[in-house]
Amino acid sequence: MGANIVVNDVGAKLDGTGNDVGPAQSVVEEISELGGKAVASTASVASVAGGKQIIDKAIEEFGRLDIVVTPAGILRDRMIFNMTKEEWQDVIDVHLTGTFSVVAPASKIFREQKSGRIVTFSSVSGLIGYSGQSNYGAAKDGIAGFTRVVAKELGKYGVTANAISPGANTRMTQSVPDSTRAMRAGVFKPAEEEHFLYDPDDVAPVVGWLCTDSASHINGEVIHACLLYTSDADDDTPCVDLGGLRIIKK
């Protein structure tokens, strides 16, 4: 049946500068071409006011809110002994505070209407660890914990909250230098070829499924939608197999 969507992208360059509506608007146009309805937003989730602005826009444009998905992110990779407070804080503000700034105002609506779906974005970097990403890993593991708590708080109101740990090429991940990729290469072993997962299109169905009635029993979980690689570290981690995906029981 489709959905009415607020597409939010602050439109910044990788260095954090700029506020271009182009990235959000291009997605809006793609949705419109497929017969859907969408509007663009360039609010910054790094501020509580920006997060509320996104939620308010959904209510103003479409009259209700049923789902929030919070994939906003930036990278400021640096070894801990070289990392500045600004590099630390920028990543925490966008990822962790950014998740809170959207979920908090949405939760009030969901609690009142006794329904809603929340899908946040964690990462292997937080759950397992990548060198050079103490800021990113802390934020992403924080999102996993945040999501589990929100799930407990809102579950009794008919609301589910789950986190995805994805693996996909985006504007952000394309900025990772080859030297860094090589340094991390030993952390993973290749998955079976038929399980390769590389593009956002491969992750999107997991997000969509979590927002359906058939996933109403899934709450407070962290789901690995990251099948380009499987992690050695997961071998001893209790988890539930879900059609090739893994729900981490942490």
Regions found by a protein language model. Give the residues of each.
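Substrate-binding pocket helix/loop in short-chain dehydrogenase/reductase
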Residues: I31, M79-I80, E87-Q89
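A glycine-rich helix->loop->beta "capping" turn
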Residues: L34-K37, K57-T70, R76, S115, ...
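The beta1-alpha1 cofactor-binding region of Rossmann-like NAD(H)/NADP(H)-dependent oxidoreductases
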Residues: T42-Q53, K85
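Active-site helix of classical SDR
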Residues: V103, A139
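Active-site-adjacent segment of SDR/Rossmann-fold oxidoreductases
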Residues: K108-E112, I128, A144, V149-V159, ...
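Residue(s) in the substrate-gating loop at a strand-loop-helix junction
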Residues: S123
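Conserved small/polar residues in nucleotide/adenosyl-binding loops
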Residues: Y229-D236
